[in-house]
């Protein structure tokens, strides 16, 4: 019995470690967007002064962004301040980011510099 508990505990610990590394190392802070995390595997399609559009297969207009991405955003100190359609507004201090999730496309817009 003790061996089974140890084995299950080890498997859970390894699973948690894998989840942590896969989730938290899949995103990088964006200098342009005040350190807001951006998926490493998202491809920049178009960039303007206050906005960037990424091609990202995990983005969905119907389901938004994956829960792992939400967790990373929250862990970096960004608070969700509202939703409007496909837009979700995040705030950290006096900085606001509008994240728009559409099918296979992620758009980030900063409120002001």
Where are these regions (language model features)?
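Short N-terminal helix-initiation segments at or just after the protein's N-terminus
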Residues: 1-2, 34
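Hydrophobic membrane-insertion alpha-helices, especially the h-region
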Residues: 3-23
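Alpha-helical interaction segments
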Residues: 9-10, 23-24, 68, 79-80
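Intrinsically disordered, low-complexity regions enriched in Ser/Pro/Gly/Gln/His and often acidic
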Residues: 13, 49, 69-73
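Intrinsically disordered, low-complexity segments enriched in small/polar residues
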Residues: 18, 25, 52, 67, ...
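Compositionally biased P/S/T/G-rich terminal and signal peptide-adjacent segments
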Residues: 21-58
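Short, surface-exposed ligand-recognition loops at beta-strand->loop->(often short) alpha-helix junctions
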Residues: 58-64
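Structured, soluble extracytoplasmic/luminal domains of envelope-associated proteins
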Residues: 69-113
């Amino acid at each position: 019995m003790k061996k089974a508990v140890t084995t299950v505990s080890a498997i859970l610990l390894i699973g948690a470690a894998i989840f942590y590394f896969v989730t938290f190392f899949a995103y990088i802070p964006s200098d342009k967007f005040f350190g807001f995390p951006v998926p490493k595997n998202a491809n920049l399609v178009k960039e303007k002064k206050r906005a960037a559009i990424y091609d990202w297969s995990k983005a969905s207009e119907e389901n938004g962004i994956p829960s792992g991405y939400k967790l990373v955003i929250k862990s970096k100190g960004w608070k969700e301040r509202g939703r409007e359609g496909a837009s979700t507004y995040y705030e950290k201090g006096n900085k606001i980011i509008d994240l728009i999730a559409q099918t296979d496309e992620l758009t980030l817009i900063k409120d002001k510099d």
